[in-house]
């Protein structure tokens, strides 16, 4: 660079946010350095138009993601040097860089597209901040679809809002409510303290625990129900009664065995940790219908898969074996 002062002025016009002081220090060292990576063709033309022989352009390989937003949270991101920093890009960074064999996922693009479209429609209807969905093969844990909204175009990472990065399907931890009642019934059957036709009579519409009220969401729920009917009618009080038969320790152990309240392994690192729970009589009661206890959608899918496939443990996976 012959006239450094003039050059710096031109650069400042092209890149107003560039640290000119640092650039000047680099120029004084008279050493090769990177001015900017991953420039556009327009930027290249403008820099070339400066007519400086000291400006060189390097061609590098980069990834192009044809599906854009569709698999953004699963695929993840890479940094300027194309090292994975999230998702599959990070977990399988070495494989993708140095292994000639293809990495094939279990995901189905058609299913992913349809589910994403439905979630986007629901977000408009309910004006929700975000949403997520997982579709898993209950027999082998293959994840066919994993959607988290809002998502992002992986090809335009520099313009993404931080909230869009959150993988709500695997990282988000939530109180999931009545879907836990399935685990309460399954726990009771597993421990042998109930049968599906076990009768629960004179169920009140409201009980108290530590001075706090627990009631039915629907006062039309009958007072006499079988264990199966408690699940069908989504009864809160009936679920509490089943949980009381199981007991705190056995209920907690059952939820741990099916991977609901302990962190599980997955092919990407963005997996949430359920919040620690101090068990007691009231916690047992509220946990029976999914309140005061947290987990991720990924773990919910695993738990339901185990119940659906006859009790066989499965490991959720994104990679075809």
Kindly label every feature range from the protein language model.
Residues 1-2, 76-81, 145-151:
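Short beta->alpha transition motifs characteristic of CBS
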Residues 133, 137-178, 183-321:
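Beta-lactam-recognizing serine transpeptidase/beta-lactamase-like catalytic domain environment
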Residues 32, 46, 95-131, 139:
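Conserved, well-ordered alpha-helix/loop/beta-strand core segments that scaffold catalytic motifs
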Residues 17, 53-58, 124-138:
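Short N-terminal helix-loop-first-beta-strand/juxtamembrane motif that initiates sensory/input modules
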Residues 6-13, 22-101, 105:
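Small/polar-residue-rich segments within soluble enzyme cores
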Residues 22-28, 127-129, 137, 200-201:
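Short, glycine-/polar-rich solvent-exposed loops and beta-turns at beta-strand/coil boundaries
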């Amino acid at each position: 660079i012959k006239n450094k002062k003039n050059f710096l002025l031109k650069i400042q016009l092209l890149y107003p946010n560039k640290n000119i002081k640092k650039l000047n220090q680099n120029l004084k060292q008279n050493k090769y350095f990177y001015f900017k990576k991953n420039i556009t063709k327009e930027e290249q033309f403008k820099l070339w138009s400066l007519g400086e022989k000291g400006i060189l352009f390097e061609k590098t390989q980069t990834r192009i993601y044809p599906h854009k937003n569709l698999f953004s949270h699963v695929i993840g991101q890479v940094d300027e040097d194309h090292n994975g920093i999230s998702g599959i890009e990070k977990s399988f960074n070495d494989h993708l860089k140095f292994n000639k064999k293809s990495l094939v996922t279990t995901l189905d693009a058609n299913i992913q597209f349809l589910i994403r479209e439905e979630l986007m429609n629901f977000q408009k209807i309910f004006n929700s901040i975000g949403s997520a969905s997982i579709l898993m093969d209950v027999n082998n844990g293959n994840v066919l679809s994993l959607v988290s909204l809002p998502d992002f175009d992986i090809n335009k990472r520099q313009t993404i809002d931080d909230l869009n990065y959150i993988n709500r399907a695997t990282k988000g931890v939530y109180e999931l409510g009545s879907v836990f009642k399935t685990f309460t019934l399954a726990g009771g059957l597993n421990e042998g303290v109930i049968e599906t036709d076990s009768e629960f009579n004179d169920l009140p519409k409201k009980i108290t625990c530590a001075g706090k009220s627990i009631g039915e969401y629907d006062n039309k729920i009958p007072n006499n129900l079988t264990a199966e009917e408690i699940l069908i009618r989504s009864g809160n009080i009936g679920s509490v009664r089943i949980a009381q038969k199981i007991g705190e320790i056995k209920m907690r152990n059952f939820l741990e065995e099916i991977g609901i309240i302990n962190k599980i392994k997955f092919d990407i690192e963005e997996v949430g940790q359920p919040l620690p729970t101090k068990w007691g009589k009231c916690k047992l009661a509220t946990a029976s219908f999914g309140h005061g206890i947290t987990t991720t959608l990924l773990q919910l899918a695993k738990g339901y898969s185990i119940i659906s496939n006859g009790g066989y443990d499965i490991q959720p996976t994104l990679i075809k074996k």
